[in-house]
Amino acid sequence: MDAPKAGYAFEYLIETLNDSSHKKFFDVSKLGTKYDVLPYSIRVLLEAAVRNCDGFLMKKEDVMNILDWKTKQSNVEVPFFPARVLLQDFTGIPAMVDFAAMREAVKTLGGDPEKVHPACPTDLTVDHSLQIDFSKCAIQNAPNPGGGDLQKAGKLSPLKVQPKKLPCRGQTTCRGSCDSGELGRNSGTFSSQIENTPILCPFHLQPVPEPETVLKNQEVEFGRNRERLQFFKWSSRVFKNVAVIPPGTGMAHQINLEYLSRVVFEEKDLLFPDSVVGTDSHITMVNGLGILGWGVGGIETEAVMLGLPVSLTLPEVVGCELTGSSNPFVTSIDVVLGITKHLRQVGVAGKFVEFFGSGVSQLSIVDRTTIANMCPEYGAILSFFPVDNVTLKHLEHTGFSKAKLESMETYLKAVKLFRNDQNSSGEPEYSQVIQINLNSIVPSVSGPKRPQDRVAVTDMKSDFQACLNEKVGFKGFQIAAEKQKDIVSIHYEGSEYKLSHGSVVIAAVISCTNNCNPSVMLAAGLLAKKAVEAGLRVKPYIRTSLSPGSGMVTHYLSSSGVLPYLSKLGFEIVGYGCSICVGNTAPLSDAVLNAVKQGDLVTCGILSGNKNFEGRLCDCVRANYLASPPLVVAYAIAGTVNIDFQTEPLGTDPTGKNIYLHDIWPSREEVHRVEEEHVILSMFKALKDKIEMGNKRWNSLEAPDSVLFPWDLKSTYIRCPSFFDKLTKEPIALQAIENAHVLLYLGDSVTTDHISPAGSIARNSAAAKYLTNRGLTPREFNSYGARRGNDAVMTRGTFANIKLFNKFIGKPAPKTIHFPSGQTLDVFEAAELYQKEGIPLIILAGKKYGSGNSRDWAAKGPYLLGVKAVLAESYEKIHKDHLIGIGIAPLQFLPGENADSLGLSGRETFSLTFPEELSPGITLNIQTSTGKVFSVIASFEDDVEITLYKHGGLLNFVARKFS
């Protein structure tokens, strides 16, 4: 099916770009003054509507509704044609299997199967198939800064238990187990080992990234998933518009952001904004790059691939104005968390958020994409940052050519999609405007005993004094007033030092769960560089350490040139596992310990970890503060938390000049520049090389290149589905539903997980019996999610949820009654009997049928069971669309009526005739075997849905188009 012809009704808007490229584009800004006040995100929706307006799937009325967004928001549904689709392997399998099956159907109908291709660019990332079978579970030694391999940290061994693990964000392997091995059975030995084994948490310890481990895991991955990988490789060969990113390359969201994003699309010399929908939960991240995108279900992405739009309610758009300048000591993490916290408090659920104002230019692309990625935290559909100069600078660093960037900028400015701080005229109008003054976001620390006790850095000195005075409790230490100024002298390494209340004795820079943003680690390194150059040092008795979360952190600290300066201040790399923050601290010197005991001093530990409970770092260190990495370095240099950074110096330079924190604190611009040059560029180059080179196993993987896929009849993962078995060249007239039995009588809020569970396959289920009969053991069953490419498994798994409550049964169970025989059977077995007897089926349900996550098999499964219609009080809209898309009629009780009020038992048979001229919302009559007649609503909303239903669903509709 060809993509819709470019805006037949709006050809008069086509212009030629005023540059050397002479590309064409739709100048939507010529639609009038209404366009000028639209939010940027709505302008992207409008451009797509204009470009794809064909009078059927996209009507002129839809274009006008978007243009009139100000009055139509939240009231109308509009279609949207995204520029591209992003799939992961789990959701990609059923979509590509359907396309492969469609080729078979088109050939059967006498058409050319080679015409069957996705209608838009489709990228499929294989990043959900890796399981960790081999790992190393000891704390790793630091790499040699001068080069050389990592020292081996543990014995490579296959794990005894191999649960399915999804890849962790931003890496191709999951962090390993913290299990240190089989403990001895002797109780004394067991107790001793517990006391002496480092406590490792799964968020911090990673498998050793040595070739031996990676290669062994990849070898198992390719063996375990060979069928699927061969199918994906065949798909990438025969389908135009399909690109497969092989396993071992990276995470879907990382690849989408750093490699697949175009910002501006070019197709047949026509320019238009990049946009994307996909099944990756991190899809919203690209909005930070000025690319409109959000997550949808598998069936929606497949619909887009088949040439149909996604549908959305025209959203409210909350304008978030960023003003002021951030406090010089504020880090990127402070800003990101401050903004997301504010959005959560305001309430933006189900809305678009769009950022504007002078403060936006202070946010790096990393900041923006992080905020955009945190949409689930505050409930927004997406958070959009229009393209600006910061975006272009980032794209320059990630490989875009100068000519491409110039063309991009010219186009975006021509259609008023480029944000310019210097030109505030014609600012968009928003549903609501909220203001966040970046000055209001202040740097803070947490402590001295609990993570939730936040203290602004400006209040640190007074707060610590208050803690000394307060009674012993969550914050207090109850130190007598006359002892609060006590000083104890110590001799250490030939010099004399003085300790007092507030003295820092432990300082640890840790890149872990809450400080993995590169900018804060680089800020710590840049601060260390400036401190060393100013002649500042950390007192030698302070236990300093640097624990990167991964080798990547070490790489960019080294490549940016700041690692030697951290080392100069004593922040040497100690390892890559949990250490300081779980209490695995090197012991303090005897001199310090004796001084603390002698003066009963409240000394301090300061770290950039996530736990600071009293005594956690060391029994004798009573005050522990969590801080950003640069603040850890700053307090270590100061040697005390009892300091006001605004008025008191950190120390003096060799000439005796006072050096204050503001003298050595790196600016955000400086940090962003180094981040772009030494992190973003490095990561992009590594990713690009990986994708373009592939890997040996993928490159050598044999796969067919035939027009039709050679289905393996023995395969339990990939089968040619039966959706097209009865497909005819032309759609036949709508058939009456005669004497249909009720397969299931369900209540309210039946979810898609009740209908099509995605979890493990129960050993006593119909799917398990099918797999067992094909020689598989229970350990080899895998999950329903992994077998989405096998319709036989998925059909047997339909309504197989053990929590399904069928009123015929009276208790939760995946069972029903086969009424002709009176038997209680598995749902699949009953449906199979009905089909053999030629009896059509319907489902009775209550309110919100099909709620929960979008799931394609929640519609496909019932269809293959023989369900012709669902009769419910109300539907989750997305699921109702799915039912129509597969050819099941969504019928709805009249308002105020339901099965109970009509006296239906579900044991009757039901008959229904469709009129020749079916129209949206038409009322139909159902007659039961008891003689009762009642009216229902055929819940079709427009002519497109009726057309799809008459064709027997979306797949049949498209197959006929191709044939």
From Swiss-Prot:
Coiled coil segments of this chain: none
Residues the record lists as binding [4Fe-4S] cluster: C512, C578, C581
Protein role: RNA-binding protein that binds to iron-responsive elements (IRES), which are stem-loop structures found in the 5'-UTR of ferritin, and delta aminolevulinic acid synthase mRNAs, and in the 3'-UTR of transferrin receptor mRNA. Binding to the IRE element in ferritin results in the repression of its mRNA translation. Binding of the protein to the transferrin receptor mRNA inhibits the degradation of this otherwise rapidly degraded mRNA.
Disease / disorder: Neurodegeneration, early-onset, with choreoathetoid movements and microcytic anemia: An autosomal recessive disorder characterized by severe neurological and extra-neurological manifestations. Clinical features include early-onset global developmental delay, absent speech, dystonia, spasticity, choreoathetoid movement disorder, seizures, and microcytic hypochromic anaemia unresponsive to iron supplementation.
Organism in which the protein naturally occurs: Homo sapiens
GO cellular component, one term: cytoplasm
Location (main, coarse): cytoplasm
Locations listed in the record: Cytoplasm
Subunit structure: Interacts with RBCK1 isoform 1 and isoform 2 only in iron-rich conditions. Interacts (when associated with the 4Fe-4S) with FBXL5. Interacts with CIAO1 and CIAO2A.
A biological process from GO: intracellular iron ion homeostasis
UniProt entry keywords in alphabetical sequence: 4Fe-4S, Cytoplasm, Disease variant, Iron, Iron-sulfur, Metal-binding, Neurodegeneration, RNA-binding, Ubl conjugation
Cofactor note as given: Binds 1 [4Fe-4S] cluster per subunit. [4Fe-4S]-binding affects RNA-binding activity, thereby inhibiting activity of the protein.
SUPFAM superfamilies assigned: Aconitase iron-sulfur domain, LeuD/IlvD-like
PTM comment: Ubiquitinated and degraded by the proteasome in presence of high level of iron and oxygen. Ubiquitinated by a SCF complex containing FBXL5. Upon iron and oxygen depletion FBXL5 is degraded, preventing ubiquitination and allowing its RNA-binding activity.
Gene Ontology molecular function: 4 iron, 4 sulfur cluster binding; aconitate hydratase activity; iron-responsive element binding; metal ion binding; mRNA regulatory element binding translation repressor activity; RNA binding
PROSITE patterns registered for this protein in UniProt: ACONITASE_1, ACONITASE_2
Record InterPro entries: AcnA_IRP_Swivel, Acnase/IPM_dHydase_lsu_aba_1/3, Acoase/IPM_deHydtase_lsu_aba, Aconitase/3IPM_dehydase_swvl, Aconitase/IRP2, Aconitase_4Fe-4S_BS, Aconitase_4Fe-4S_dom, AconitaseA/IPMdHydase_ssu_swvl
UniProt record similarity statement: Belongs to the aconitase/IPM isomerase family.
Highest taxon in the source lineage: Eukaryota
Cofactor(s) needed for function: [4Fe-4S] cluster
Top-level taxonomy: Eukaryota, Metazoa, Chordata, Craniata, Vertebrata
Protein name per its UniProtKB record: Iron-responsive element-binding protein 2
Coiled coil found in the keyword field: no
Record PANTHER family: ACONITASE/IRON-RESPONSIVE ELEMENT FAMILY MEMBER
